[in-house]
């Protein structure tokens, strides 16, 4: 092998190594910014197609309905705890901050946060539904995939 071919081989190897390193770093950076969507039932029993359950500490988005009677507010701070549910199960959520104006018991929400021990979500963001007939698209898609509809929502007679 002559010197010219050797130089070309080294250049090609260096370019491939640089490309592999760049792809690896990009994927590593994106991994920490990806929030996978789950329903409460998928957190409890795993994704239907893969049976993969989320890990403690994983960032995720969870969509479901706020369970009537589950909202508890701390009178001394903005801390709120509530339960969200779907046709297969329920998970507890803690959130510290101002809730959206449309947040109510029996309404659809999507929370974004981290999974903690005991199927508890520490929410960083809470998104509420827009009208009475609205179900978050992710929740509706997941429930259609399960061939189930949301559990019946109990209406507050005072409203």
Swiss-Prot record:
Q: Where is this region: Disordered?
A: 134-159
Q: Does the keyword Transmembrane helix apply?
A: yes
Which compartments does it reside in? Cell inner membrane
Q: Keyword Cell inner membrane: yes or no?
A: yes
Which residues are heme-binding?
130, 134
- Name a GO molecular-function annotation: metal ion binding
User: Which loops or segments lie on the Periplasmic side of the membrane, by the record?
Assistant: 30-159
Q: Where are the transmembrane segments?
A: 9-29
- For this UniProt record, give its keywords in alphabetical order, as a comma-separated list: Cell inner membrane, Cell membrane, Cytochrome c-type biogenesis, Heme, Iron, Membrane, Metal-binding, Signal-anchor, Transmembrane, Transmembrane helix
Biased composition (Basic and acidic residues) is annotated at 134-147
The secretion signal range is none
Q: Pfam families per the record?
A: CcmE
What's its membrane topology?
Answer: Single-pass type II membrane protein
Annotated PANTHER family: CYTOCHROME C-TYPE BIOGENESIS PROTEIN CCME HOMOLOG, MITOCHONDRIAL
Q: Which HAMAP family does its entry note?
A: CcmE
Q: Name the job this protein performs.
A: Heme chaperone required for the biogenesis of c-type cytochromes. Transiently binds heme delivered by CcmC and transfers the heme to apo-cytochromes in a process facilitated by CcmF and CcmH.
Q: Which protein family is named in the record?
A: Belongs to the CcmE/CycJ family.
Q: What is this protein called?
A: Cytochrome c-type biogenesis protein CcmE
Q: What gene codes for this chain?
A: ccmE
């Amino acid at each position: 092998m002559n010197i010219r071919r050797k130089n070309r081989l080294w250049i090609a190897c260096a370019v491939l190594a640089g490309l592999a390193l760049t792809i690896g770093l990009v994927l590593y950076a994106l991994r920490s910014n990806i929030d996978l969507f789950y329903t409460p039932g998928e957190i409890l029993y795993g994704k239907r197609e893969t049976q993969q359950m989320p890990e403690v500490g994983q960032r995720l988005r969870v969509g479901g309905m706020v369970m009537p009677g589950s909202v508890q507010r701390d009178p001394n701070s903005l801390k709120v705890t509530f339960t969200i549910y779907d046709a297969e199960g329920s998970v507890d959520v803690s959130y510290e901050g101002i809730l959206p104006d449309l947040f109510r018991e029996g309404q659809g929400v999507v929370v974004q946060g981290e999974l903690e021990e005991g199927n508890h979500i520490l929410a960083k963001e809470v998104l509420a539904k827009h009208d009475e007939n609205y179900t978050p698209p992710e929740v509706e898609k997941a429930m259609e995939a399960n061939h189930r509809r949301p559990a019946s929502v109990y209406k507050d007679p005072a409203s």
